[in-house]
Regions:
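N-terminal secretory signal peptides
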Residues: 1-9
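Active-site acidic/histidine proton-transfer and metal-coordination neighborhood
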Residues: 17-19, 23-28, 43, 47, ...
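C-terminal segment of N-terminal export signals and the immediately downstream linker at the start
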Residues: 29-61, 71-72
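Hydrophobic faces of well-ordered beta-strands that scaffold small-molecule active sites
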Residues: 53-59, 77-79, 108-113, 148-150, ...
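Catalytic domains of carbohydrate-active enzymes, especially glycoside hydrolases
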Residues: 61-82, 144
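Conserved, mostly hydrophobic/aromatic
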Residues: 69, 77, 101, 129, ...
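Glycine-rich, proline-tolerant flexible connector loops at the mouths of alpha/beta enzymes
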Residues: 79-98, 155-158
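Gly/Pro-rich active-site loop or hairpin
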Residues: 88, 197-201, 205, 224-294, ...
Length: 341
């Protein structure tokens, strides 16, 4: 039984939030063009110890994109690797990135590093992947961050138990000493793909049963559970002490298509910005508040309705993508206490 002090009780939750999440109406309706609200930017690194989640966006690095995140009212960014943002950068280049973030008034919350297959069946590729990821952990530390998001690896044809054992061994033997030395943590996103075997609660539990250290956890994304017909709220409770980061993304399911093609077919689901799919955000975010999650909730914008194709490499977001980020923030912040907006 959990200590009564482990979670916020209802009285504390209402006191901090000012209202119950269930009493709030939905926000974030569409508009032809939504102007970025000029929210006063807080200094980079603001409120790192605040006992509630920080809203952020997942983005490639560019000064313009960091500036937009701050102007749009987000508290941080989760940055993906690229030519101008990677473990091979010099100290002076990293100093410039941090200076850019300070100027924008935004905090780099964490980094993503999905490419390495930590348990690649090929010994040479496996060793190279592990060395590459250790550099990512060091890069995280050099940036002053505390978390790296990744995948759990994959071995085609191997059983779930064997893959869990392999991933746990890699973490315990290779990554944990580095994490402890640098005071960082890592976690995998539950995205169903070949090089990411641990995307169900059963697989997650098998891994964690072999890894006592809380420096390995989850980059929890409710949208992926929805399309696997797994309840993300129940999963969040089950792994409450292993949620180190959160992706905010929704899933829309088109039932008429699903009834025709089945779950093995195509076109019956798509990712949406938060609030425009079927994730129960009231229940999910209430779980995060009750377990006192204080990490980053990062909007992972994969909603094609609020985007423009073939623009990801541009230095700034197109207006339609900005609109999606703005709607996502407006929707999510109604459930979170202590917002600046």
């Amino acid at each position: 039984m959990e200590s009564e002090n482990s979670f916020w009780n209802r009285r504390d939750f209402l006191k901090v939030g000012g209202t119950s999440a269930a009493a709030l109406g939905l926000a974030g309706t569409a508009a032809d063009t939504i102007q970025a609200e000029q929210v006063p930017a807080a200094p980079a690194g603001t409120r790192p110890d605040a006992p509630y989640p920080k809203l952020s966006i997942i983005t490639p690095y560019s000064p313009q994109k960091l500036a937009f995140a701050a102007q749009a009212g987000y508290e941080g960014v989760v940055v993906t690797p690229g030519r101008d943002f990677n473990p091979n950068l010099s100290d002076s280049a990293i100093d410039q990135i941090l200076s850019t973030a300070r100027t924008a008034g935004i905090r780099i919350v964490s980094i993503e590093y999905f490419a390495p297959n930590h348990t690649d069946p090929d010994a040479g590729k496996r060793a190279a992947a592990q060395a590459d990821f250790i550099r990512a952990l060091e890069f995280c530390h050099r940036l002053g961050c505390k978390f790296v998001g990744t995948f759990s690896g994959g071995q085609p044809g191997a059983s779930m138990e064997d893959q869990a054992a392999a991933f746990a061994d890699v973490f315990n033997e290779k990554y944990l000493p580095v994490c402890e030395k640098l005071d960082v943590a890592m976690g995998w996103e539950n995205y169903p793909t070949g090089a990411n075997f641990a995307t169900t609660p059963a697989a997650m539990q098998t891994v964690f049963g072999r890894v006592p250290s809380k420096r390995l956890g989850l980059e929890f994304d409710p949208s992926h559970f929805v399309r696997l017909y797994i309840d993300p709220v129940s999963a969040a409770w089950q792994f409450k002490d292993r949620i180190l980061a959160v992706h905010a993304k929704d899933t829309e399911i088109t039932q008429p298509v699903l009834q025709q093609v089945g779950i093995a077919g195509q076109g019956w689901w798509r990712y949406r910005i938060p609030g425009q799919g079927i994730v129960n955000w009231t229940a999910f975010l209430t779980v995060l508040l009750q377990i006192r999650f204080s990490g980053g909730i990062a909007v992972e914008h994969e909603d094609q309705f609020w985007d423009v194709p073939r623009t990801s490499d541009l230095p700034d977001f197109p207006q339609q993508r900005k609109d999606g980020f703005l709607l996502a923030r407006r929707f999510l912040e109604q459930y979170l206490p202590g917002r600046q907006t």
